[in-house]
Swiss-Prot record:
Taxonomy, superkingdom: Eukaryota
TM ranges: 22-42, 63-83, 92-112, 119-139, 150-170, 185-205, 299-319, 330-350, 358-378, 381-401, 423-443, 452-472
Catalyzed reactions per annotation: taurine(out) = taurine(in)
GO CC, alphabetical: basolateral plasma membrane; plasma membrane
Keyword Membrane annotated: yes
Membrane topology recorded in Swiss-Prot or TrEMBL: Multi-pass membrane protein
Subunit structure: Forms functional complexes with BSG/CD147 or EMB/GP70 ancillary proteins.
Known function: Monocarboxylate transporter selective for taurine. May associate with BSG/CD147 or EMB/GP70 ancillary proteins to mediate facilitative efflux or influx of taurine across the plasma membrane. The transport is pH- and sodium-independent. Rather low-affinity, is likely effective for taurine transport in tissues where taurine is present at high concentrations.
Keyword annotations from UniProtKB, A to Z: Cell membrane, Membrane, Phosphoprotein, Transmembrane, Transmembrane helix, Transport
Pfam hit, one: MFS_1
Protein name, UniProt field: Monocarboxylate transporter 7
Source organism of the structure: Rattus norvegicus (Rat)
Subcellular location: Basolateral cell membrane
Length: 522
Protein backbone atom coordinates (compact mmCIF):
# COMPACT_ATOMS: atom_id res chain seq x y z
CA UNK A 1 0.00 0.00 0.00
CA UNK A 2 2.82 2.36 0.89
CA UNK A 3 4.63 1.51 -2.33
CA UNK A 4 1.45 2.20 -4.31
CA UNK A 5 0.95 5.58 -2.65
CA UNK A 6 4.58 6.44 -3.26
CA UNK A 7 4.17 5.60 -6.93
CA UNK A 8 1.05 7.75 -7.18
CA UNK A 9 2.88 10.71 -5.63
CA UNK A 10 5.72 10.36 -8.13
CA UNK A 11 3.54 10.19 -11.23
CA UNK A 12 2.55 13.22 -13.26
CA UNK A 13 -0.74 15.01 -12.63
CA UNK A 14 -2.95 14.91 -15.74
CA UNK A 15 -5.62 17.60 -16.10
CA UNK A 16 -7.98 18.63 -18.89
CA UNK A 17 -7.35 22.28 -17.99
CA UNK A 18 -5.15 24.32 -15.68
CA UNK A 19 -6.31 23.19 -12.20
CA UNK A 20 -5.81 26.49 -10.32
CA UNK A 21 -5.27 24.40 -7.20
CA UNK A 22 -5.06 20.69 -6.42
CA UNK A 23 -1.45 19.57 -6.07
CA UNK A 24 -0.54 23.11 -7.04
CA UNK A 25 -0.96 24.13 -3.40
CA UNK A 26 1.78 21.66 -2.42
CA UNK A 27 3.98 23.09 -5.17
CA UNK A 28 3.26 26.60 -3.85
CA UNK A 29 4.31 25.55 -0.33
CA UNK A 30 7.50 24.02 -1.75
CA UNK A 31 8.22 27.25 -3.61
CA UNK A 32 7.79 29.20 -0.36
CA UNK A 33 10.46 27.19 1.45
CA UNK A 34 12.77 27.15 -1.58
CA UNK A 35 12.56 30.96 -1.50
CA UNK A 36 13.50 30.81 2.19
CA UNK A 37 16.69 28.85 1.56
CA UNK A 38 17.75 30.54 -1.70
CA UNK A 39 16.98 34.24 -2.02
CA UNK A 40 16.38 34.51 1.71
CA UNK A 41 19.94 33.41 2.46
CA UNK A 42 21.41 35.57 -0.32
CA UNK A 43 19.66 38.70 0.92
CA UNK A 44 20.67 37.98 4.51
CA UNK A 45 24.34 37.48 3.67
CA UNK A 46 25.08 41.09 4.59
CA UNK A 47 25.24 40.06 8.26
CA UNK A 48 28.55 38.30 7.47
CA UNK A 49 30.22 41.22 5.66
CA UNK A 50 32.06 42.80 8.59
CA UNK A 51 33.15 39.37 9.90
CA UNK A 52 34.56 38.39 6.51
CA UNK A 53 36.36 41.73 6.10
CA UNK A 54 38.01 41.29 9.51
CA UNK A 55 38.85 37.58 9.08
CA UNK A 56 40.29 37.83 5.55
CA UNK A 57 41.58 41.43 5.90
CA UNK A 58 40.00 42.35 2.57
CA UNK A 59 38.23 45.42 1.23
CA UNK A 60 34.48 45.79 0.96
CA UNK A 61 34.50 45.42 -2.82
CA UNK A 62 36.40 42.11 -2.69
CA UNK A 63 33.96 40.68 -0.16
CA UNK A 64 31.11 41.89 -2.37
CA UNK A 65 32.40 39.65 -5.15
CA UNK A 66 31.23 36.60 -3.19
CA UNK A 67 27.57 37.47 -3.70
CA UNK A 68 28.26 38.97 -7.13
CA UNK A 69 29.70 35.72 -8.44
CA UNK A 70 26.89 33.78 -6.78
CA UNK A 71 24.20 35.94 -8.41
CA UNK A 72 26.06 35.85 -11.73
CA UNK A 73 26.30 32.05 -11.77
CA UNK A 74 22.69 31.76 -10.60
CA UNK A 75 21.48 33.87 -13.53
CA UNK A 76 24.10 33.01 -16.17
CA UNK A 77 23.34 29.29 -15.96
CA UNK A 78 19.57 29.80 -16.27
CA UNK A 79 19.49 28.41 -19.85
CA UNK A 80 21.31 25.31 -18.59
CA UNK A 81 18.66 24.95 -15.89
CA UNK A 82 15.94 25.20 -18.53
CA UNK A 83 17.62 22.56 -20.70
CA UNK A 84 18.10 20.14 -17.81
CA UNK A 85 14.53 20.70 -16.64
CA UNK A 86 13.11 19.97 -20.08
CA UNK A 87 15.31 16.87 -20.28
CA UNK A 88 15.07 15.38 -16.78
CA UNK A 89 12.09 17.12 -15.21
CA UNK A 90 11.68 19.72 -12.48
CA UNK A 91 12.00 17.32 -9.55
CA UNK A 92 15.48 15.93 -10.23
CA UNK A 93 16.94 19.30 -11.17
CA UNK A 94 15.67 21.01 -8.01
CA UNK A 95 16.87 18.18 -5.76
CA UNK A 96 20.30 18.31 -7.38
CA UNK A 97 20.34 22.07 -6.90
CA UNK A 98 19.55 21.71 -3.21
CA UNK A 99 22.52 19.39 -2.78
CA UNK A 100 24.85 21.85 -4.52
CA UNK A 101 23.62 24.74 -2.37
CA UNK A 102 24.31 22.87 0.85
CA UNK A 103 27.72 21.56 -0.24
CA UNK A 104 28.85 25.04 -1.30
CA UNK A 105 27.75 26.73 1.93
CA UNK A 106 29.27 24.03 4.15
CA UNK A 107 32.56 24.23 2.22
CA UNK A 108 32.56 28.02 2.65
CA UNK A 109 32.59 27.63 6.43
CA UNK A 110 36.07 26.06 6.14
CA UNK A 111 37.49 28.73 3.79
CA UNK A 112 40.83 30.31 4.69
CA UNK A 113 40.99 32.75 1.75
CA UNK A 114 38.32 34.89 0.16
CA UNK A 115 38.89 33.31 -3.27
CA UNK A 116 37.84 29.97 -1.78
CA UNK A 117 34.46 31.53 -1.02
CA UNK A 118 34.31 32.72 -4.62
CA UNK A 119 34.34 29.04 -5.59
CA UNK A 120 32.24 27.51 -2.81
CA UNK A 121 29.45 30.08 -2.44
CA UNK A 122 29.92 31.88 -5.74
CA UNK A 123 30.11 28.96 -8.15
CA UNK A 124 28.87 25.83 -6.37
CA UNK A 125 26.03 27.35 -4.36
CA UNK A 126 25.24 29.80 -7.17
CA UNK A 127 24.68 26.91 -9.56
CA UNK A 128 22.50 25.22 -6.98
CA UNK A 129 20.41 28.35 -6.49
CA UNK A 130 19.69 28.45 -10.21
CA UNK A 131 18.74 24.77 -10.39
CA UNK A 132 16.44 25.15 -7.38
CA UNK A 133 14.64 28.43 -7.99
CA UNK A 134 13.94 28.65 -11.73
CA UNK A 135 12.30 25.22 -12.28
CA UNK A 136 10.10 25.76 -9.22
CA UNK A 137 8.68 29.11 -10.32
CA UNK A 138 8.11 27.67 -13.81
CA UNK A 139 6.12 24.62 -12.69
CA UNK A 140 4.15 26.74 -10.21
CA UNK A 141 2.97 28.93 -13.09
CA UNK A 142 1.76 25.81 -14.91
CA UNK A 143 -0.48 24.77 -12.00
CA UNK A 144 -2.29 28.12 -11.81
CA UNK A 145 -3.98 30.46 -14.28
CA UNK A 146 -6.51 32.85 -12.75
CA UNK A 147 -4.81 32.71 -9.35
CA UNK A 148 -1.27 32.73 -10.72
CA UNK A 149 -0.35 36.28 -9.69
CA UNK A 150 -1.77 35.95 -6.20
CA UNK A 151 -0.34 32.49 -5.46
CA UNK A 152 3.11 33.36 -6.80
CA UNK A 153 3.18 36.61 -4.85
CA UNK A 154 2.24 34.92 -1.57
CA UNK A 155 4.59 31.96 -2.10
CA UNK A 156 7.47 34.28 -2.93
CA UNK A 157 7.22 35.90 0.50
CA UNK A 158 9.41 33.06 1.75
CA UNK A 159 12.54 35.12 1.16
CA UNK A 160 11.00 38.02 3.11
CA UNK A 161 10.27 35.88 6.17
CA UNK A 162 13.77 34.44 5.84
CA UNK A 163 15.31 37.93 5.89
CA UNK A 164 13.20 38.85 8.91
CA UNK A 165 14.21 35.70 10.79
CA UNK A 166 17.76 35.12 9.55
CA UNK A 167 19.20 38.62 10.09
CA UNK A 168 18.70 38.80 13.88
CA UNK A 169 19.01 35.03 14.37
CA UNK A 170 22.35 34.73 12.57
CA UNK A 171 23.62 37.88 14.30
CA UNK A 172 22.83 36.32 17.68
CA UNK A 173 24.19 32.93 16.61
CA UNK A 174 27.52 34.45 15.56
CA UNK A 175 28.03 35.83 19.05
CA UNK A 176 27.83 32.32 20.51
CA UNK A 177 29.45 30.04 17.92
CA UNK A 178 31.19 32.40 15.48
CA UNK A 179 30.55 33.12 11.81
CA UNK A 180 32.07 29.85 10.53
CA UNK A 181 29.75 27.57 12.47
CA UNK A 182 26.88 29.88 11.60
CA UNK A 183 27.60 29.33 7.90
CA UNK A 184 27.81 25.60 8.54
CA UNK A 185 24.42 25.66 10.25
CA UNK A 186 22.86 27.57 7.33
CA UNK A 187 24.32 25.05 4.88
CA UNK A 188 22.75 22.15 6.75
CA UNK A 189 19.38 23.92 6.79
CA UNK A 190 19.55 24.31 3.02
CA UNK A 191 19.37 20.53 2.58
CA UNK A 192 15.62 21.03 2.98
CA UNK A 193 15.56 22.26 -0.62
CA UNK A 194 15.92 18.61 -1.68
CA UNK A 195 12.77 17.73 0.26
CA UNK A 196 10.87 20.56 -1.42
CA UNK A 197 12.11 19.44 -4.83
CA UNK A 198 10.80 15.92 -4.24
CA UNK A 199 7.26 17.36 -3.97
CA UNK A 200 7.28 18.92 -7.45
CA UNK A 201 5.03 16.53 -9.38
CA UNK A 202 5.03 17.17 -13.14
CA UNK A 203 1.80 18.37 -14.74
CA UNK A 204 0.25 17.46 -18.11
CA UNK A 205 -2.61 19.44 -19.64
CA UNK A 206 -4.63 17.55 -22.25
CA UNK A 207 -7.67 18.71 -24.19
CA UNK A 208 -11.08 17.73 -22.76
CA UNK A 209 -12.26 16.56 -26.17
CA UNK A 210 -9.60 13.89 -26.50
CA UNK A 211 -9.07 12.13 -23.18
CA UNK A 212 -6.27 9.91 -24.43
CA UNK A 213 -4.54 12.48 -26.56
CA UNK A 214 -1.32 14.18 -25.73
CA UNK A 215 -0.03 17.38 -27.34
CA UNK A 216 0.62 17.04 -31.05
CA UNK A 217 3.78 15.77 -32.62
CA UNK A 218 5.40 18.04 -35.20
CA UNK A 219 3.88 18.18 -38.69
CA UNK A 220 6.47 15.78 -40.07
CA UNK A 221 5.23 13.08 -37.68
CA UNK A 222 1.64 13.59 -38.87
CA UNK A 223 2.80 13.23 -42.47
CA UNK A 224 4.62 10.06 -41.51
CA UNK A 225 1.47 8.61 -39.95
CA UNK A 226 -0.57 9.44 -43.03
CA UNK A 227 1.90 7.57 -45.23
CA UNK A 228 1.96 4.54 -42.94
CA UNK A 229 -1.69 3.95 -42.09
CA UNK A 230 -1.10 0.39 -41.00
CA UNK A 231 1.48 1.39 -38.42
CA UNK A 232 0.35 1.21 -34.81
CA UNK A 233 2.57 2.75 -32.20
CA UNK A 234 2.00 2.99 -28.48
CA UNK A 235 3.89 5.46 -26.39
CA UNK A 236 3.70 4.78 -22.69
CA UNK A 237 4.79 7.41 -20.20
CA UNK A 238 6.13 5.93 -16.98
CA UNK A 239 5.20 9.09 -15.08
CA UNK A 240 1.67 9.71 -16.37
CA UNK A 241 0.42 6.40 -17.72
CA UNK A 242 -0.95 8.22 -20.79
CA UNK A 243 -1.06 6.14 -23.98
CA UNK A 244 -1.15 7.50 -27.52
CA UNK A 245 -2.26 5.12 -30.28
CA UNK A 246 -1.63 6.23 -33.84
CA UNK A 247 -3.99 3.86 -35.61
CA UNK A 248 -5.47 4.79 -39.02
CA UNK A 249 -8.73 5.90 -37.43
CA UNK A 250 -6.87 8.35 -35.23
CA UNK A 251 -4.67 9.85 -37.93
CA UNK A 252 -7.34 12.10 -39.53
CA UNK A 253 -8.23 13.62 -36.16
CA UNK A 254 -4.59 14.32 -35.51
CA UNK A 255 -4.21 15.99 -38.89
CA UNK A 256 -7.30 18.08 -38.26
CA UNK A 257 -6.01 19.16 -34.89
CA UNK A 258 -2.71 20.09 -36.50
CA UNK A 259 -4.61 22.50 -38.72
CA UNK A 260 -6.68 23.96 -35.90
CA UNK A 261 -4.04 24.59 -33.27
CA UNK A 262 -0.28 24.83 -33.08
CA UNK A 263 1.02 23.73 -29.72
CA UNK A 264 4.42 24.79 -28.50
CA UNK A 265 6.91 21.94 -28.72
CA UNK A 266 8.09 22.33 -25.17
CA UNK A 267 4.60 21.40 -23.96
CA UNK A 268 4.68 17.96 -25.53
CA UNK A 269 4.63 14.99 -23.23
CA UNK A 270 8.14 14.00 -22.23
CA UNK A 271 8.86 10.34 -22.83
CA UNK A 272 11.92 8.20 -22.46
CA UNK A 273 14.63 8.31 -25.11
CA UNK A 274 13.98 4.77 -26.21
CA UNK A 275 10.30 5.53 -26.76
CA UNK A 276 10.57 8.68 -28.83
CA UNK A 277 12.94 9.73 -31.54
CA UNK A 278 11.54 13.27 -31.79
CA UNK A 279 11.92 15.75 -28.99
CA UNK A 280 10.85 19.31 -28.49
CA UNK A 281 13.70 21.84 -28.50
CA UNK A 282 15.25 22.02 -25.06
CA UNK A 283 15.55 25.80 -25.36
CA UNK A 284 13.43 27.88 -27.76
CA UNK A 285 15.47 30.85 -29.00
CA UNK A 286 12.66 32.13 -31.22
CA UNK A 287 11.61 34.37 -28.33
CA UNK A 288 14.62 36.55 -29.14
CA UNK A 289 12.70 37.73 -32.22
CA UNK A 290 10.02 39.21 -29.98
CA UNK A 291 10.84 42.89 -29.40
CA UNK A 292 8.58 43.13 -26.38
CA UNK A 293 10.53 40.30 -24.76
CA UNK A 294 13.83 42.04 -25.58
CA UNK A 295 12.61 45.19 -23.81
CA UNK A 296 11.48 43.11 -20.85
CA UNK A 297 14.87 41.41 -20.56
CA UNK A 298 16.57 44.83 -20.60
CA UNK A 299 14.24 45.81 -17.78
CA UNK A 300 15.43 42.78 -15.82
CA UNK A 301 19.05 43.58 -16.67
CA UNK A 302 18.96 47.08 -15.18
CA UNK A 303 16.53 46.29 -12.35
CA UNK A 304 18.90 43.66 -10.97
CA UNK A 305 21.28 46.48 -10.04
CA UNK A 306 18.75 47.60 -7.47
CA UNK A 307 17.62 44.23 -6.13
CA UNK A 308 20.58 42.92 -4.15
CA UNK A 309 22.90 45.78 -3.14
CA UNK A 310 20.49 47.53 -0.71
CA UNK A 311 20.00 44.38 1.36
CA UNK A 312 23.78 43.88 1.42
CA UNK A 313 24.64 47.43 2.45
CA UNK A 314 21.80 48.52 4.73
CA UNK A 315 23.51 47.09 7.84
CA UNK A 316 26.97 48.58 7.09
CA UNK A 317 25.24 51.89 6.26
CA UNK A 318 23.48 51.90 9.62
CA UNK A 319 26.68 51.08 11.50
CA UNK A 320 28.55 53.86 9.65
CA UNK A 321 25.91 56.33 10.88
CA UNK A 322 26.56 55.32 14.49
CA UNK A 323 23.69 52.85 14.88
CA UNK A 324 24.30 49.81 17.09
CA UNK A 325 24.75 46.57 15.06
CA UNK A 326 21.67 44.98 16.65
CA UNK A 327 19.49 47.93 15.64
CA UNK A 328 21.10 47.97 12.19
CA UNK A 329 20.17 44.30 11.73
CA UNK A 330 16.61 45.25 12.68
CA UNK A 331 16.55 47.54 9.61
CA UNK A 332 17.01 44.50 7.38
CA UNK A 333 14.22 42.68 9.20
CA UNK A 334 11.93 45.68 8.80
CA UNK A 335 12.70 45.76 5.10
CA UNK A 336 11.75 42.09 4.87
CA UNK A 337 8.40 42.56 6.63
CA UNK A 338 7.54 45.50 4.37
CA UNK A 339 8.40 43.32 1.39
CA UNK A 340 5.85 40.73 2.55
CA UNK A 341 3.07 43.31 2.45
CA UNK A 342 4.32 44.56 -0.90
CA UNK A 343 4.22 41.09 -2.45
CA UNK A 344 0.79 40.19 -1.08
CA UNK A 345 -0.62 43.59 -2.01
CA UNK A 346 0.73 43.28 -5.54
CA UNK A 347 -0.76 39.81 -5.83
CA UNK A 348 -4.18 41.12 -4.82
CA UNK A 349 -3.97 43.95 -7.35
CA UNK A 350 -2.78 41.78 -10.25
CA UNK A 351 -5.42 39.15 -9.47
CA UNK A 352 -8.16 41.59 -10.45
CA UNK A 353 -9.67 41.32 -13.94
CA UNK A 354 -9.41 43.10 -16.25
CA UNK A 355 -6.15 44.88 -15.50
CA UNK A 356 -3.04 45.67 -17.53
CA UNK A 357 -0.40 44.15 -15.28
CA UNK A 358 2.58 45.59 -17.13
CA UNK A 359 1.47 49.15 -16.29
CA UNK A 360 1.10 48.34 -12.59
CA UNK A 361 4.62 46.93 -12.66
CA UNK A 362 5.90 50.13 -14.28
CA UNK A 363 4.40 52.33 -11.55
CA UNK A 364 6.07 50.18 -8.89
CA UNK A 365 9.46 50.39 -10.64
CA UNK A 366 9.26 54.19 -10.68
CA UNK A 367 8.41 54.28 -6.97
CA UNK A 368 11.26 51.85 -6.26
CA UNK A 369 13.67 54.24 -7.99
CA UNK A 370 12.48 57.03 -5.71
CA UNK A 371 12.97 54.85 -2.63
CA UNK A 372 16.58 54.07 -3.60
CA UNK A 373 17.41 57.76 -3.94
CA UNK A 374 15.80 58.38 -0.55
CA UNK A 375 18.46 56.24 1.21
CA UNK A 376 21.15 58.80 0.30
CA UNK A 377 19.41 61.48 2.39
CA UNK A 378 18.95 59.42 5.58
CA UNK A 379 21.18 60.44 8.49
CA UNK A 380 19.76 58.60 11.51
CA UNK A 381 17.93 55.43 12.53
CA UNK A 382 14.34 56.51 11.92
CA UNK A 383 15.19 57.97 8.54
CA UNK A 384 16.72 54.64 7.53
CA UNK A 385 13.72 52.86 9.00
CA UNK A 386 11.33 54.87 6.83
CA UNK A 387 13.45 54.28 3.73
CA UNK A 388 13.65 50.55 4.51
CA UNK A 389 9.87 50.26 4.80
CA UNK A 390 9.35 52.16 1.55
CA UNK A 391 12.02 50.19 -0.32
CA UNK A 392 10.89 46.84 1.07
CA UNK A 393 7.27 47.35 0.06
CA UNK A 394 8.25 48.49 -3.45
CA UNK A 395 10.79 45.75 -4.09
CA UNK A 396 8.17 43.27 -2.90
CA UNK A 397 5.75 44.41 -5.60
CA UNK A 398 8.36 43.62 -8.26
CA UNK A 399 10.36 40.76 -6.78
CA UNK A 400 7.44 38.34 -6.67
CA UNK A 401 5.98 39.17 -10.08
CA UNK A 402 8.71 40.05 -12.58
CA UNK A 403 9.32 36.42 -13.62
CA UNK A 404 5.65 35.25 -13.55
CA UNK A 405 4.76 38.25 -15.76
CA UNK A 406 6.61 36.46 -18.56
CA UNK A 407 3.52 34.24 -18.78
CA UNK A 408 1.37 37.25 -19.70
CA UNK A 409 0.58 37.93 -23.36
CA UNK A 410 2.11 41.38 -23.06
CA UNK A 411 5.47 39.57 -22.91
CA UNK A 412 5.64 35.98 -24.29
CA UNK A 413 2.75 33.92 -22.85
CA UNK A 414 2.58 30.71 -20.83
CA UNK A 415 3.59 28.41 -23.72
CA UNK A 416 7.03 29.97 -24.05
CA UNK A 417 7.56 30.80 -20.40
CA UNK A 418 10.05 28.01 -19.68
CA UNK A 419 12.50 29.12 -22.36
CA UNK A 420 11.76 32.81 -21.75
CA UNK A 421 12.53 32.48 -18.04
CA UNK A 422 15.88 30.85 -18.82
CA UNK A 423 16.92 33.56 -21.26
CA UNK A 424 15.52 36.36 -19.09
CA UNK A 425 17.42 35.28 -15.98
CA UNK A 426 20.54 34.68 -18.10
CA UNK A 427 20.48 38.33 -19.24
CA UNK A 428 20.22 39.40 -15.60
CA UNK A 429 23.57 37.73 -14.92
CA UNK A 430 25.51 40.71 -16.28
CA UNK A 431 24.17 43.20 -13.76
CA UNK A 432 24.10 40.51 -11.08
CA UNK A 433 27.87 40.22 -11.50
CA UNK A 434 28.57 43.96 -11.78
CA UNK A 435 26.04 45.41 -9.33
CA UNK A 436 27.45 44.70 -5.83
CA UNK A 437 31.13 45.28 -6.81
CA UNK A 438 30.18 48.58 -8.45
CA UNK A 439 28.43 49.64 -5.27
CA UNK A 440 31.40 48.41 -3.22
CA UNK A 441 33.80 50.39 -5.41
CA UNK A 442 31.83 53.57 -4.78
CA UNK A 443 32.00 52.85 -1.05
CA UNK A 444 35.76 52.16 -1.09
CA UNK A 445 36.50 55.38 -2.95
CA UNK A 446 34.25 57.67 -0.94
CA UNK A 447 34.08 55.82 2.41
CA UNK A 448 30.38 56.73 2.40
CA UNK A 449 27.99 53.77 2.32
CA UNK A 450 25.09 55.83 1.01
CA UNK A 451 26.94 56.13 -2.33
CA UNK A 452 26.24 52.45 -2.94
CA UNK A 453 22.60 53.31 -3.50
CA UNK A 454 23.32 55.70 -6.38
CA UNK A 455 24.23 52.92 -8.79
CA UNK A 456 21.13 51.00 -7.71
CA UNK A 457 18.86 53.98 -8.34
CA UNK A 458 20.41 54.71 -11.73
CA UNK A 459 19.93 51.12 -12.85
CA UNK A 460 16.32 51.08 -11.69
CA UNK A 461 15.61 54.30 -13.59
CA UNK A 462 16.88 52.70 -16.81
CA UNK A 463 14.76 49.64 -16.01
CA UNK A 464 11.66 51.82 -15.88
CA UNK A 465 12.39 53.18 -19.36
CA UNK A 466 12.78 49.67 -20.82
CA UNK A 467 9.63 48.40 -19.10
CA UNK A 468 7.66 51.33 -20.51
CA UNK A 469 8.55 50.12 -24.04
CA UNK A 470 7.25 46.55 -23.59
CA UNK A 471 3.60 47.26 -24.29
CA UNK A 472 4.20 49.59 -27.29
CA UNK A 473 6.41 46.92 -28.86
CA UNK A 474 3.71 44.29 -28.39
CA UNK A 475 1.11 46.60 -29.94
CA UNK A 476 3.29 47.03 -33.02
CA UNK A 477 5.24 50.23 -32.51
CA UNK A 478 8.52 48.39 -33.10
CA UNK A 479 7.11 45.11 -34.42
CA UNK A 480 7.98 43.56 -37.77
CA UNK A 481 4.65 42.21 -39.07
CA UNK A 482 6.42 39.25 -40.70
CA UNK A 483 8.39 38.21 -37.62
CA UNK A 484 5.58 36.73 -35.55
CA UNK A 485 3.90 33.38 -35.85
CA UNK A 486 0.24 32.57 -35.45
CA UNK A 487 -0.35 30.61 -32.28
CA UNK A 488 -3.32 29.41 -30.30
CA UNK A 489 -5.58 31.96 -28.70
CA UNK A 490 -7.09 29.64 -26.08
CA UNK A 491 -7.95 31.19 -22.77
CA UNK A 492 -5.39 33.98 -23.25
CA UNK A 493 -7.25 35.89 -25.97
CA UNK A 494 -9.58 37.67 -23.58
CA UNK A 495 -6.65 39.43 -21.92
CA UNK A 496 -5.61 41.17 -25.15
CA UNK A 497 -8.87 42.09 -26.82
CA UNK A 498 -7.70 45.63 -27.41
CA UNK A 499 -4.53 44.59 -29.28
CA UNK A 500 -4.71 44.57 -33.13
CA UNK A 501 -5.29 41.11 -34.58
CA UNK A 502 -1.94 41.19 -36.42
CA UNK A 503 -0.24 40.81 -33.07
CA UNK A 504 -2.66 38.38 -31.43
CA UNK A 505 -1.82 34.75 -31.00
CA UNK A 506 -4.80 33.72 -33.10
CA UNK A 507 -6.95 30.63 -33.08
CA UNK A 508 -6.16 28.90 -36.36
CA UNK A 509 -9.50 27.15 -36.14
CA UNK A 510 -11.08 30.47 -37.07
CA UNK A 511 -8.75 30.84 -40.02
CA UNK A 512 -9.08 27.37 -41.49
CA UNK A 513 -8.35 28.30 -45.12
CA UNK A 514 -5.07 29.89 -44.06
CA UNK A 515 -4.20 26.82 -42.05
CA UNK A 516 -4.71 24.62 -45.10
CA UNK A 517 -2.40 26.82 -47.10
CA UNK A 518 0.36 26.39 -44.51
CA UNK A 519 0.15 22.60 -44.35
CA UNK A 520 2.88 21.96 -46.88
CA UNK A 521 4.38 18.49 -47.03
CA UNK A 522 7.62 18.17 -45.17
Amino acid sequence: MTQKNSKLCSRANVYTQVPDGGWGWVVAASFFFIEVFTYGVIKSFGVFFNDLMDSFDESNSKISWIISICVFIMTFTAPLSTILTNRFGHRLVVMGGGLLISVGMIAASFSQRVYQMYISIGIVSGLGYCFSFLPTVTILSQYFDKRRSMVTAVASTGECFAMFAFAPAITALKEHIGWRYSLLFVGLLQLNVMVCGALLRPIIIKGPGSPKAIPLEPRREVQYMLENEKTRTSIDSIDSGVELTTSPKNVPSEAKREQEVRVEQQQTLVVGPKHSQKRAPLLDFSILKDRSFICYTLFGLFATLGFFAPSLYIIPLGISLGIHPDRAAFLLSTMAIAEVFGRIGMGLVLNREPIRKIYIELICVILLTVSLFAFTFATEFWGLMLCSVFFGSMVGTIGGTHIPLLAEDDVVGIEKMSSAAGVYVFIQSISGLAGPPLAGLLVDQSKIYSRAFYSCAAGMALAAVCLALVRPCKKGLCQNPHSGENQTDGHRGKALQDIPEDFLEMDLGKCEPRAHMKMDPV
